[in-house]
Amino acid sequence: MGLLERLRKEWFIIGIILVIVAAKLEPTIGEKGGPLKPEITITYIAVSAIFFNSGLSLKTEELTNALMHVKLHLFVQLFTLVFFPTAIWIFLQVLSLTPINEWLLKGLQTVSCMPPPVSSAVILTKAVGGNEAAAIFNSAFGSFLGIVVTPLLLLLFLGSSSSVPFTSIFSQLFMTVVVPLIIGQIVRRYIKDWLERKKPPFGAISSCVLLMIIYTTFCDTFSNPNIDLDTFSLVVIVFIIFFIQLAFMLLTFLFSTSKNSGFTPADTVAIVFCSTHKSLTLGIPMLKIVFAGYEHLSLISVPLLIYHPAQILLGSVLVPTIKSWMLSRRKALKLTRQPKIPL
């Protein structure tokens, strides 16, 4: 494989490196309130574009079938909103014996209580070629569920409570997720033949939107003065976050590929991403509401600010590996299902 062909194949990973470097060099461009206005362009336009894109590319029957996949939905929601926070709470009982800042540890607990994001898990599932319809449903449903469940989890594990503006968050999610998806499905009905004939690069479009999300996320991270921690604490927290992500991705992978799970390789891809990703878009505003008045709010927020770009970075790097596994697994399953020719 020539160098140019290799670069073309790995354009997305190269793009990730470039946008992170660009964010580090001049974070003010993509930070909140900056020239790119990510609080509008990302929160509303980019997320809406992702789900409009999904509505255009997905067959209606695929979405309908995904709604009926109750076992998959239960697995994802129970893992991300029950098992995840409980496992982290147990893990933190051990970490509390170390010299790591206690507020950073509380921040790790808040990460575990967050709902799944409405965009990154869908884009990564699409990039691999997994069950995108299931990823869309679980990301959207998990986000709606998290609006109610996350404050209760924070109260349970950290003893924090506050009134959460459910109506405004629900309406924002509805307008940026449900409405664009429905519009995409309606438009698809009228241009279905053209879409099947031309086959637009929906995956590449979603990946470009994800690069924009990565860029603005890192701009916000690099421009945040509250992340000025001592090197030891920062390195340890980053290491722990990557360890948690890899461990839980492996765990969901093993569960969903076990002999009696009943999940397809495409289902496994959606499960791995949807079960382990956490929302920064909903998370940070929710932390500001729930922990209003806390002098350590900035420290509590740090793990989530690190977790979000880390999950996108790790997921993006693993896309080729997971895609290769999924294709080989599909091929193996197809061969085992073929009827044997009698001798």
Curated annotation (Swiss-Prot):
The chain crosses the membrane at residues 10-30, 38-58, 72-92, 117-137, 139-159, 164-184, 202-222, 235-255, 271-291, 299-319. Signal peptide: none annotated. It is a multi-pass membrane protein. GO terms for molecular function: symporter activity. The keyword Cell membrane applies. Keywords: Cell membrane, Endoplasmic reticulum, Golgi apparatus, Ion transport, Membrane, Sodium, Sodium transport, Symport, Transmembrane, Transmembrane helix, Transport. InterPro entries: Na+/solute_symporter_sf, Put_Na-Bile_cotransptr. It comes from the Eukaryota. Residues 31-37, 93-116, 160-163, 223-234, 292-298 are extracellular. Residues 1-9, 59-71, 138, 185-201, 256-270, 320-343 are cytoplasmic. One of its GO terms (biological process) is sodium ion transport. It is found in: Cell membrane; Endoplasmic reticulum membrane; Golgi apparatus membrane. GO terms for cellular component: endoplasmic reticulum membrane; Golgi membrane; plasma membrane. Belongs to the bile acid:sodium symporter (BASS) (TC 2.A.28) family. Involved in teeth and skeletal development. Has an essential role in the biosynthesis and trafficking of glycosaminoglycans and glycoproteins to produce a proper functioning extracellular matrix. Required for extracellular matrix mineralization. Also involved in the regulation of cellular calcium homeostasis. Does not show transport activity towards bile acids or steroid sulfates. This is Sodium/bile acid cotransporter 7-B. It comes from Xenopus laevis (African clawed frog).
